[in-house]
Amino acid sequence: MPSTPSGEPVLYLFFSGTHRRPRSFIAFGLDLFNTAFRRNRFDFGDPEVLARLESMVPVIGNTLYASNSHVLNQGLKASTAIIKCPLKELEKSVPVFVRQTIDILKEIGSTESEVAQTALKSLAMIVRDKANAEVKEKDLVYLLELLAPDLEEPGRQASVFAILRAIVARKFIVPEIYDLMDRVSEIMVTNQSPQVQELCRSVLLQFLLDYPQGKGCLRTTMAFLAKNTAYMYESGRISVLELLSAIVSKFEESLIGDYADLLFVALVMVIANDDSAKSREMAAEIIKNLFLRLDVDHRQLLVSHVRSWAGQKENSQLTRVAVQVYGIMLDALQTNVSTYLPSMIDDLNLNILRSVEQLTKEEEDQTDIDSQWQVVYHIFTVLGKVIRIYPDVATRPQRLSWTAVVEHLLFPHAWVRMAAARLLGQLFSMLPVAEPPKDGYSTTSPLAGLNLKDIAEKHCTQLKSSRLSPTLGLQIVKNLFYIGKCFCAAKVSGPQPAMDVENENEDEDDPGEGDSEHEEANSDNPLAWLFSKLSYQIRSAYIARRSCSADCVSEFCLYIDGSHSRADRKIGTSNPLPYFASSRQWQTTWRPLCCKNS
């Protein structure tokens, strides 16, 4: 075999007309050419190679007129390969390739045969890659009619979608393509194959972006997509959400604004009703992107919907989803949500107060609690986001209903208790340690209306739970530590007398007995009351191997030992808190605990 100056072999194919050579020889030569091209054996930088390839263009074109199916199949593959070469001869040969390939399809009359499948793939490559490859309108109509029955045939979908993508990419416009795209939209939803759904979404998105869409036509498409966000099968819903995500990202803002209301309501219903976590997450992400793409006026329209839903007292599910959307808004807009922040906080406060009303009913129905906890949990979660973005909201007097938050510390559902404790922890982290005023906090204080002793008592009650989670236990310890530091800052008239051993032994048997007497005795010393309260729980906590109460006491002792200089006490050598409990209690419980943790 001859070679180029660089030493690379050159492949010669001799054709003197398809009627003069045996068909098998012609098919073999075409197959040899296709194999050489597939293995990159042609050096396009070599003028000699290009000159020889130039002479092959009309020869390959002649094979498209062969009557033998094997020769025709190899010739179609060769035409697909040769158009990728930088050859001048292709300028006049490409239209011939296109016309003859369409004639082959017309002669066959269906897409079932191997030759027809190869012809479709070849035509798709030529139309896609060559700008001078034109398709007449009547031929385009014929192709679309030929493709329609095979859109859902698994064995032929690859070639069908290949030619369809090529047609859409070249923006060939005939009325029939709009009808075909309606079919593609349906297949995108109903087909169970992820690969087919991806092909449909790709073609449909390109069609929506590049083709003229009248308002009526586009609205019909958007309504179809919005409706099918509630399709019966998860795969179909996810396919629709994938396309909606691309639409919201790539459409012009003016178009998104026109259909924002329609899409927003559909997506919110997905969050409210869909049993698939993936669908709900995708809908939330699309809503987030939707808020970012909209102008102020359209954004305000959506917020008005959310406010309306948040005010639905009798429909807790609608209230819940409204609160969730507020959280999505915060995630999307961050500091740009300030315009809507006052109304948002009003809605959240209103629903917290409603929840308090439910809790204070004398005969509460458990099913009501079950339906209410999600609303409250999401409210506290959203308020946590608000405080992270706008810290002044937490410390501004009478902005948030903190008293209502405290009322939920003993809510029947653990998630709500956790969210309420975490929210209080955020508040405490922003406030300096200060002595609680005896007459209560003023209306100008962030803690207005709150009673630290009441909060501490609720936290202590939570610590008794056998189902206390480590996360909630840690948050309670943090909150009690802040409250304890505030109590430590309080001035006391003198040390509290220790409890006698007899009373202490009684308390060990029944920790709740005598609490009222201790509270009365410790009314001027809240820290003593708190230590007494926790000391009753430490013994049972050790037995149950729940260490939150012990951790809390340990932190108090270490804090007092390290920072309360006026006491001038040393942990481990003497009782630093002689007025908190008896010396026996210090020696048997607190001293070993503090020495262990210090």
Stretches found by the model and what they are:
Residues 39, 43, 84-89, 129-130, ...:
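Alpha-solenoid helical repeat scaffolds
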Residues 22-41, 69-82, 113-124, 153-164, ...:
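HEAT-repeat alpha-solenoid elements in large eukaryotic scaffold proteins
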Residues 382-400, 462, 466-475, 479-482, ...:
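Extended amphipathic secondary-structure runs
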Residues 3-15, 47-61, 91-106, 134-151, ...:
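HEAT/HEAT-like alpha-solenoid repeats
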